[in-house]
Amino acid sequence: MRILFLSRRYFPAISGMSVYAQNLLRELVGAGHDVTMISQYRGDAFGTRVYGGGPPPPVPGVRVIGLEQLGEQTSGDFERDIATMVDAIAREHARNPFDILHAQYGYPTGWAVLLAARKLGVPSVVSIQGGDGHWVGSCCETHRVAMCEVLAHANALLIGGASFVDEVCERLGSDPARFTIVPGAVDTDRFAQGTSDGLPAPHDGPVRLFYHGRVDRRKGVLDFIEALAILRAQGTPFAATISGIGPDVDPAKALAAERAFSERAIAFTGYAEYGSVPDLYRRADVFVSPTYAEGFSNTILEAMAAGLAVVSCHAVGVSDCLRDGENGLLVNPGDIPALAGALTRIVTDTALRRDLAEAGLEECRRVYSWSAVGRQIMGVYERVRHERPATDFSVDLPEDPTCRFRAEPHLL
C-alpha cells in the first residue's frame, strides 16, 4: 500500500507526536508498505528553542520531505502552510499515487489532508492526538469549523482513549461512533531497565523524581516545582530532575529560583536526543506527570516500561492507562497540596513504590506494544482504502483574526 503520512511535528523536535510517528513508520515499513512522510518543522530560532527545530532526519525505508512552517513562524499564517502541504501531497501523488493519506493532528495537518483527499480522490485517516482535541477549535471560529469538518468528513478518525473521545465530542459536537480507539504504545525493550526484575537498581541517596517531556505549564511543570517546595518544607528528602524544552522553561527556572531551589536540588537538563532518553529514565525512581490533559501520554508509557512508579493526574488521556492506587497515584490537576501528598507517599513508602512500578510494568508489557497498535492502524487503512473521500463540505473557512494562536502558533 502507498501511504502518505503527514506529521505536525517530527524529530529533531521533541514531542509525543515525534515518538508516535517514528514507531508507526517503523511498523509500516516492516509490514512492506511504501511510505512517504511529509513533516512540518520550525526553522526559526524561537521555534527551535521551544520545541527543537530543523528538517526531519532520514527514516529507514521512508521517503522524507520537510516543509518549513514559514507562515506560522513569521505571522501565524496557518493558511499559507496548509496550502504548501496540500501542494506537496499533490506533487508526490502525481509522481506515484497514494492509497491512503494519514494526518497526525486535526489542524492544520488534518485539514490539509482533508483538502488533499478531496482534490486527489484518496481516502483520509486523521489521528487526534493532543491539543487538537483539547483546545484547537475553542480558540476561534476558523479553527472550530476546520476541526468540525475534519471530524465529520475524514474516512477514519483515530484517538487514544474513551476519555478523549468524550472530551472531543462534548467540546465540538462530534459523533462518538466516528472514532476508532487506538491506544498509545511503547517499545518496551528499548526502555527496559536491564535489571532482573525490570525495576530501578538499588542506589544510595534520596528517591529520584523525574519530569520529562515538554516543559509547559499545561503539563504541570510549575505545579511540580510548587509541590517540591512543600516536600522540602516538611523535610522529605528527594532528588528532582526536569528534562526537556518547551514554552515554559524560563518561567519554570524562575519559579525554582524564587522558591530558593539550587541548581543541584532541581536539575534542569534541557533538550534530550531521543536516543538518550531511555538512559534518563534509568537514572530515576519515580516519574511525575502532573498534566492537565493528554491525548495518550507517551512519556507515562515510557516510564511504565522503564519500571518507574508514576504520579500523575485524573486527566483526559491519563485515566485510560493509569488507575489510582493500582498502577499509579493520581490527583486532580492543579491541586498542589494533593500532588505534594502523593509525592510524599511514594517517596517514603518503598513497598508502595515497588508495587505500583511492578503493576505498571506488567500492564505495559502486556497491553501497549507497537506491534499490536501498528496492526490495528493498518487494519483501519485496509478498511477505508477503497472508500471515496468526502466532498460535501466547503473548502472555505470563516475568517476570525481574533484567534490567540495567531500570535502564539507554537502553542497550537
Question: Where would I find each of the regions flagged by the language model?
Answer:
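N-terminal subdomain of nucleotide-sugar transferases
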Residues: 1-53, 393, 398-412
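Conserved donor-binding/catalytic core segment of Leloir-type glycosyltransferases
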Residues: 4, 201-228, 241
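Carbohydrate-associated surface elements
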Residues: 41, 163, 185
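Nucleotide-activated donor-binding/catalytic signature segment of Leloir-type glycosyltransferases, i.e.
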Residues: 253-272
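Short alpha-helical donor nucleotide-sugar binding micro-motif in glycosyltransferases
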Residues: 271-272, 279-284
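Aromatic "clamp/platform" in nucleotide-sugar-dependent glycosyltransferases that forms part
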Residues: 292
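Short hydrophobic beta-strand element within catalytic cores of glycosyltransferases
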Residues: 309-312
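Conserved acidic donor-binding segment of nucleotide-sugar-dependent glycosyltransferases
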Residues: 324-325, 329-336, 345-350
